Amino acid sequence: MTEQKAIVTDAPKGGVKYTTIDMPEPEHYDAKLSPVYIGICGTDRGEVAGALSFTYNPEGENFLVLGHEALLRVDDARDNGYIKKGDLVVPLVRRPGKCINCRIGRQDNCSIGDPDKHEAGITGLHGFMRDVIYDDIEYLVKVEDPELGRIAVLTEPLKNVMKAFEVFDVVSKRSIFFGDDSTLIGKRMVIIGSGSEAFLYSFAGVDRGFDVTMVNRHDETENKLKIMDEFGVKFANYLKDMPEKIDLLVDTSGDPTTTFKFLRKVNNNGVVILFGTNGKAPGYPVDGEDIDYIVERNITIAGSVDAAKIHYVQALQSLSNWNRRHPDAMKSIITYEAKPSETNIFFQKPHGEIKTVIKWQ
């Protein structure tokens, strides 16, 4: 048994504590790792609040180590041609089960769901907020760009964006989505929310040629507006200014009332990507006119969750590109750096938060 410090919850009940745990060293592993930075997102906070009923502890355990947005350092590794001691790596969150999608490396599209697949720090598999991690090389993605530094901790949330655009590429082919110049230039993309995930969606949308607007029901901070401006992203307080004629709508809020409010602004042949989840959000009474609007305009609504290993690789490539073009803006995405003992950050967001990370070492 290895005694180590960890941040744990009791899923799905919730709660959080920074404590000492005993974790057995596995008989077989490829790499021994330690966390450098761990990101905190709405999923972590939802778990701590007891708001995510789908979460659960590993079998036979009465706790779950939190943390899925991880940047790890290799402390030791078996002989291989990919990673070595001292390298920085990003671990895959979702681990495969036995379905056909899982068997081909697409556990993000698991055909069975729980308990076939597991997600580190979320469903049945301990996360990365602990001193020591043992893992297999196939579940690690090497950070090739030494200039990224702590920005590489954004790989995990960004891989969700890469996957969502893969979904968009597939479903948008049901009609001619591109403009008459064969590009997406001038097509309108609206992102509901202004947290870190929304920022990453907006940057990726700009890369693809979209005219991108992030929206929320309040005005935004100067820091957020400055970052948006540098990337060419607009912002709208939708209580004052509701965007119209939307081609691609992405929801990061998980709030059905807000989503349906914007859905009625989507163009013919438009696409809606649902990404945010919020099990405690109030219901929305969908009526016949809502259904008519979707059907008569050939609107496609698609949920998108998690990602495959290829999307982690794509995310790291995008982070490197953005960091070269907008180094100051990318540094500004991480707005607060906490210590492991600061568990209050799971209950209260620091003022002006875009992304809060825990510096583990």
Swiss-Prot record:
GO MF annotations, alphabetized: D-glucose binding; galactose 1-dehydrogenase (NADP+) activity; galactose 1-dehydrogenase activity; galactose binding; glucose 1-dehydrogenase (NAD+) activity; glucose 1-dehydrogenase (NADP+) activity; glucose 1-dehydrogenase [NAD(P)+] activity; NAD+ binding
Entry keywords, A to Z: Carbohydrate metabolism, Metal-binding, NAD, NADP, Nucleotide-binding, Oxidoreductase, Zinc
EC main group: oxidoreductase
Swiss-Prot/TrEMBL catalytic activity: D-glucose + NAD(+) = D-glucono-1,5-lactone + NADH + H(+); D-glucose + NADP(+) = D-glucono-1,5-lactone + NADPH + H(+); D-galactose + NAD(+) = D-galactono-1,4-lactone + NADH + H(+); D-galactose + NADP(+) = D-galactono-1,5-lactone + NADPH + H(+)
BP GO annotations: galactose catabolic process via D-galactonate; non-phosphorylated glucose catabolic process; protein tetramerization
TM spans (from-to): none
Keyword Disulfide bond: no
Functional description taken from the UniProt entry: Catalyzes the NAD(P)(+)-dependent oxidation of D-glucose to D-gluconate via gluconolactone. Is also significantly active with galactose as substrate, but not with mannose or glucose 6-phosphate. Can utilize both NAD(+) and NADP(+) as electron acceptor, with a marked preference for NADP(+). Physiologically, may be involved in the degradation of both glucose and galactose through a non-phosphorylative variant of the Entner-Doudoroff pathway.
Subunit structure and binding partners: Homotetramer.
UniProt protein name: Glucose 1-dehydrogenase
Organism listed in the record: Thermoplasma acidophilum (strain ATCC 25905 / DSM 1728 / JCM 9062 / NBRC 15155 / AMRC-C165)
Organism classification: Archaea, Methanobacteriati, Thermoplasmatota, Thermoplasmata, Thermoplasmatales
Name of the gene: gdh
